[in-house]
Amino acid sequence: MDKKWDVVIIGGGLAGFVAANYLARNQLSILILEKNKKVGGRARTDHIRQQYFNLGPHALYKKSKAKSILEELNIQLSGKSPKKGGVLVKGNLEYTAPFTPIGLLNTSFLSWKERIEWAKVLLKVMSIQPEKLAQQTYEQWVQQTTRLANVQSLLYLLGRLSTYCHSPEKVSGMVVLLHLKAVMSGVLYLDKGWQTMIDQLHNNCVIFGGQVQTRKCIKQIVPIKQNHFKLVLSDDEVIYGKNVLSTVGPKELTQMLGEKSPFSQIDSFTKMESVMGATYDVALTQLPNPKKLFAMGIVEPIYFSVHSNYALLSDDAKNIVMHVFKYHNPNDNIDTKKVKSELEHFLEKIQAGWKNYEITSRFIPQITVNQRIPQIGDEQILQCSKNKIPGLYIAGDWASPDSILSEGAVTSGKQAAEEIIKKEKS
């Protein structure tokens, strides 16, 4: 007779492994199915020519639910926090970033009137209750908060930095402000990349009896009866489980459940858009300009940061690992050559002559950063999706009503696990 697992988890990324750790510790039989050769999802780190490349820039909020949950699971988080500051770029001009008291005094980007306004806005951000913005887009909140164009541009820039979202006219003001407050409290760059988190979660899961299978692509999820699911794989292998926890995106989940799925009836659920970007991950033997470690475009939605100054990201500690990233707007038509040229040009502005010191680099023109652009009303949509199919649970960076990125993945993974444990132990 085929084995029937207590929980089958679809996806071996951050959400899946966090859930698996809680479930396995509660003596439930766990099977994680990962479609790729390597586990980790977007938290994966690739070891390329002795350099550790995350899939673009990754930072963990220092004061966050995600960090607390990972520490609760005894995950060691080794690394340091980058200093606040850096430069802002507009055309060929550079300005001191007004993100510290000294930066605010020294920047030539803002007039004295704008500096006073900016200081007031930052204080407002730290004291605001984001939940009160549930019915506002980030753009609406910015325009209500200040009428000064330069101050608005700084808020849009910080919105991109904290959420990777370059669609202020769409994105929820509540979600952006929640993440912006977290960013302002500091972030952590991890030694040897985010794979270290995944490896620890993976090992702990296996120690507690969980099983992980890679290169397993789910073709169909079939609810047979109460507490009984059949999962059909692409090679027609069949796996049975009492509960299914899906950490794949909303569209992929809907496809797995088929046209008759209750999820297909939720129009907004199937039309959710992903947060996208382009990343240029670069390793150098040295920095042409060691003082420039962080930069962002004011008009150009581009980010640059040297991560290796705060985390060990090379087998040779002297080497430099940095990321250049472009935030895509959902309406962008992506021209791969043009995007790469933009990122290289931006990097050349900040680190002129960098190619002379290049060890290796990797350009990815379109990368999914988050599987949902968080919009007004998403909380109701996500709530509606709960209990549509008893025994089917969702988690992932898109599945939390008020969080995205690692915060959404980790918190939704724990919540789904707790719901399953409560059900199975009752």
Mark where each language-model region is:
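Conserved Rossmann-like nucleotide-cofactor binding loop
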Residues: 15, 38, 251
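Glycine-rich FAD pyrophosphate-binding loop
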Residues: 25-47
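Rossmann-like flavin
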Residues: 106-176, 188
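Mid-domain catalytic core of redox enzymes
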Residues: 220-225, 229-320, 383
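Conserved flavin/dinucleotide-binding core of flavoenzymes
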Residues: 307, 313-426
